[in-house]
C-alpha cells in the first residue's frame, strides 16, 4: 500500500511539472499577467510552477525595498504572498530565480485596486451588443483604462484545472462591447464611488 501511494504521489508530481509547462525555471498561470489588478490593502497569493528546489523571488515596484522569497517544491509548484498598499499604479512585478538570471518575468501595467468576481447565469455574460439603454453612447464613452476585464471562455473539464486561456484587458470601447455589461457597469460604479 505504501509503495502504491508513493507511486501515485510521484506520478502526480511528475504530471504537475510536465502538464503544459515549459522547460524554464519559472512559469505563471494566465491570471498573473500584464494589466492585472491585485486587491489593494491586502496580502495577495501569487503562485506558479518551476524546477524543483529553485528559489523564486518577487519584487513589486509598490514595495521596491522588499524581496519576497519562496522555493519550488518537489512537485514543481511554488506559492507565496505579497503585501499590497492602497490603490494606485501602474506598477511592475518582477519574478526571478537566483540560479538563472536570464529567467526573469516582468509583469507590467499592474494596478492595485478592487478585484471582484462577476459570475452567474447566462444573463451575466450578456454584452452591450445584446442591447442596453443608450448602447452606442455607452460604448463610445467606455475609455476607462483603470477598469480591467479577465474573462474566461467556456471550457469543460472532467477534473480541476490549474490554468486557463484568458488575459487581462483594459476597458476600451472595443473591449467593453464584447464583455459582460453587468460587470462593466458594476466596475464603473465602483470606480466612481470608491475613486479607484
Q: What is each of the regions a protein language model found here?
A:
Residues 1-23:
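Bacterial Sec-dependent N-terminal signal peptides
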Residues 21-196:
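Cell-envelope and extracellular/periplasmic
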Amino acid at each position: 500500500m505504501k509503495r502504491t501511494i508513493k507511486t501515485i504521489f510521484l506520478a502526480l508530481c511528475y504530471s504537475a511539472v510536465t502538464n503544459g509547462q515549459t522547460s524554464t525555471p519559472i512559469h505563471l498561470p494566465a491570471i498573473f499577467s500584464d494589466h492585472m489588478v491585485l486587491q489593494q490593502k491586502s496580502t495577495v497569493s501569487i503562485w506558479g510552477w518551476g524546477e524543483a528546489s529553485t528559489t523564486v523571488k518577487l519584487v513589486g515596484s509598490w514595495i521596491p525595498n522588499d524581496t519576497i522569497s519562496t522555493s519550488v517544491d518537489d512537485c514543481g509548484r511554488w506559492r507565496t504572498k505579497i503585501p499590497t498598499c492602497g490603490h494606485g499604479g501602474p506598477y511592475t512585478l518582477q519574478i526571478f530565480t537566483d540560479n538563472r538570471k536570464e529567467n526573469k518575468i516582468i509583469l507590467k501595467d499592474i494596478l492595485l485596486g478592487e478585484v471582484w468576481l462577476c459570475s452567474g447565469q447566462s444573463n451575466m455574460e450578456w454584452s452591450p451588443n445584446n442591447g442596453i439603454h443608450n448602447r452606442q453612447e455607452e460604448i463610445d464613452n467606455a475609455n476607462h483604462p483603470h477598469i480591467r476585464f479577465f474573462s474566461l471562455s467556456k471550457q469543460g473539464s472532467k477534473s480541476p484545472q490549474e490554468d486557463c486561456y484568458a488575459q487581462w484587458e483594459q476597458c476600451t470601447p472595443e473591449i467593453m462591447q464584447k464583455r459582460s455589461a453587468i460587470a462593466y457597469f458594476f466596475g464603473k460604479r465602483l470606480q466612481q464611488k470608491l475613486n479607484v
